[in-house]
Amino acid sequence: FTLFSCSTVTAGPVNWEGAEKYITIQQKQFCDLKNNHVLNLYNAIESRNEIKINKVKKQRQEDLDALLPSGTFENWIVKLVSIKQVNSPQDQTTDGDSAAVFELSCGTQIGSGSFLIDGKLTWGATIKFNSRQYREVSKLSSGQFAIISGTFLKLNDFVPSKKETFYASRPLTSGDLQNDKNDRYSNGDELFLSYITYIAAAN
């Protein structure tokens, strides 16, 4: 399996069956943690015990901290879900950036995301306009596979007022868990904000 620049015309994986064998041990362990977390969180929510729910969330974060020192991941193979150009004239730090979302084989999404904070739409983990990563991601199409490296963003980095050190994500809800085998969940009902430091098409 060889990495080429995005401009190189070469055969690459077209589905997860073809891409699975290139998944790194770190990426596989991340998906294993995710699958275990879904089951544990479902059982905790069913118990209607907030202490159990919080314990499950804390344990998942501790497991992720052990697997991903400083939140860093390297050479994960992903499928591009979408790329948007951020239009945020009220926030010049992200205006014009790229908001890219990628999907793992286990359905979890990683990349850029937007959240409402105090009634204001705020973008996190965008790809800076005209950066090398921006130029590379601009060559990709939805459904195409790529190799990426990056860093998960913690919630208190994104929202300084928050005390939690959990990785910033669009959370799973009880509805998501009840429908964990349907198309909605498999298309990524959990999104982790992640700064992308490297990207190349998986040709």
Regions found by a protein language model. Name each.
Residues 1-11:
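Classical Sec-dependent N-terminal signal peptides that target proteins to the secretory pathway
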Residues 9-203:
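OB-fold and OB-like single-stranded nucleic-acid-recognition modules
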